[in-house]
Amino acid sequence: VDVVRSITELRAILAPDAARLAARRRTEANAERLIHAAAAMAEAALDLDELSERANYFWKQLILSSGNLAYRLAFNSLQTAYLDHAPQFRKLIAPELQAASAYQGISQAVVDGDADLAKRRTQELVAVGDTIIMSAIEAYTSQQGGE
C-alpha cells in the first residue's frame, strides 16, 4: 500500500511540472516524439497491456522533453516501482489509459509552447488514475482496520 501510494503521489507532482517544462523548453525533435507517442495511444484500442506500454513511453518522452535531469531520475524510480506493480495499476487506471484524446491534448499544448495548459491538462489526466488508486487504497486500508 505504501509503495502504491508513494508512486501515485510522486506521479501527481512530477508529471504536470514536467509537462510545463516541456512546453517551455520545447524543441522540434521533442515535440515530434511527443506527438508520435500521443498518437500511438489512440492506435492501441482497448488492450490495457499495450496501452500501458504506450503510456509509459509517452510519459518517458514527456519527462525527457522537460530537460530536467532530476525529473528523469525520479521517473526512472517511478517507472521501476510501477513496472513491479503494473498488473494491479493497469486495471485500476484503465480510464486514464483509454483517454487517448487527453494524451493528444497534452502533447498539443507542449507543441504549442503553452506551459500552463500543458500542466493543467496533465493534472487533469493524472487525476483520473490517482482518484481511482487513492480510493482503492482507502477501501483497502479500511478493510484492514486502518494503516
Report the location of each language-model feature.
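Short amphipathic alpha-helical segments with heptad-repeat character
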Residues: R5-T8, A12, K119, Q123
